[in-house]
Design a protein with these regions (language model features):
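N-terminal structured subdomain of primase-like DNA metabolism proteins
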Residues: 1-100
Length: 104
């Protein structure tokens, strides 16, 4: 089942990438971006950046890159549907209800 783009966009509108990422990565503001230690690699110098304006994160040490859904899927080892449910709840939205068309 596919989620409608409008539903996913509403989640992204309500939640900043830094808001989601900062629950597992300590971030520091640097200009328009945030930086922190990579959640994907064991590192001593921060190479992980978050850009709320462009709605993505990027890890220069591992090459990982994505949006809030990708981040949850990769850091929590969950599927897309589960990430959508978690983020929708965090955004104060109702879970999406798929409608099924039954054909005779």
């Amino acid at each position: 089942m596919k989620y409608p783009k409008e539903y996913l966009n509403e989640i992204k509108l309500r939640l900043k990438v830094s808001q989601v990422v900062s629950k597992s990565v300590q971030l520091k503001k640097r200009g328009k971006e945030f930086i922190g230690l990579s959640p994907f690699k064991n590192e001593k110098s921060p190479s992980f950046t978050v850009n709320d304006e462009k709605e993505f994160y990027h890890c220069f040490s591992s090459g990982e890159h994505g949006n809030i859904f990708d981040f949850l899927m990769k850091t929590k080892s969950i599927g897309f549907g589960e990430a959508v449910k978690i983020l929708a709840a965090e955004a104060g939205m109702q879970p999406y209800r798929f409608s099924y068309n039954l054909r005779n």
